[in-house]
Amino acid sequence: MKEEQTRSLFGISLSDKPTWQQFLICTSGFFFGYLVNGVCEEYVYNRLQFSFGWYFTFIQGFVYLFLIYLQGFTTKHIVNPMRTYVKLSAVLMGSHGLTKGSLAYLNYPAQIMFKSTKVLPVMIMGAFIPGLRRKYPVHEYISAFLLVLGLILFTLADAQMSPNFSMIGIMMITGALIMDAFLGNLQEAIFTMNPETTQMEMLFCSTVVGLPFLFVPMVLTGEVFRAWTACAQHPYVYGVLVFEAMATFIGQVSVLSLIALFGAATTALITTARKGVTLLLSYLIFTKPLTEQHGSGLLLIAMGIVLKMVPMDSKAPAKIPARPAVRIAGGDGDREEDEERKSLV
């Protein structure tokens, strides 16, 4: 028998709600958190011209830990071995570092083109993650492709320059995409193979293990000293960072809820669509002129979303294996499942 894990989001029970309500609640939390995050980043990075990504992420980590503590989470609630989260954090920091490093070789439009394709490698890699082995129907790949193409068209219509490609930059951003794809699927696999895993555990352990990974590049690049001096001259920046971290915390927990309930690929589609929504809102709020290319991009994004939402097969539940782990009776089945679990953790 398949046992459903009870899920909740900031005290709101999700397990006893229909799927559409679960989706709406989690997506709303994600959009709220990251729209606030975008406003704060715009202020800190563009208005104040601060570019201390490692340091700001480091500060954000401590805010996360405090908020998790307020949620009542303690180490007694951890059900997975810490080595699982070492892998997770190493991949996360590697992706972050490669993305930041690629900016030295790729201009903004080129990086956006590559990062917008994230949902495709997430779907492809899902078939190779131990404990997951997820397969998707053809129409979902088409949906993802339309969404990606539409977002690229919309973004490049607003670009002040053409994409500038460099082989080193392409290799770095490709590595970041592969790590991003592995990260989302690994998180889903952890939720799948151990349904007792909570979103708070995932965020707590990833943060605790990830903080030392952040400290090394901060010291080696000297960013920690430059950031400390700059923020000492503008101490109100810490207030902005704390507010941003609180909003992003809501977004992060919502994303983990989406991964646990709907899978990594669906979550990647939502995070990709969020970029399009953010861009569209900036045009509506600041009344920027929309060109024909903007319209084409929006049309493709809408087609991708609609194609994803429309059921294409009456046998939909059978096309993707159920996420919760099911123990197979018999020695061979147990051994196979144990091998899957070992290779994951």
Swiss-Prot record:
Transmembrane segments: 20-40, 50-70, 112-132, 137-157, 164-184, 202-222, 245-265, 294-314
Record's function text: Sugar transporter involved in the transport of UDP-galactose form the cytoplasm into the Golgi apparatus.
One GO location term (cellular component): Golgi membrane
GO molecular function: antiporter activity; UDP-galactose transmembrane transporter activity
Gene: UTR2
Known tissue expression: Mostly expressed in roots, and, to a lower extent, in seedlings, shoots, leaves and flowers.
Recorded topology in the membrane: Multi-pass membrane protein
Family: Belongs to the nucleotide-sugar transporter family. UDP-galactose:UMP antiporter (TC 2.A.7.11) subfamily.
Annotated region described as Disordered, given as residue ranges: 326-345
Name recorded for this polypeptide: UDP-galactose/UDP-glucose transporter 2
GO process annotations (BP): UDP-galactose transmembrane transport
Keyword annotations from UniProtKB, A to Z: Antiport, Golgi apparatus, Membrane, Sugar transport, Transmembrane, Transmembrane helix, Transport
Subcellular location: Golgi apparatus membrane
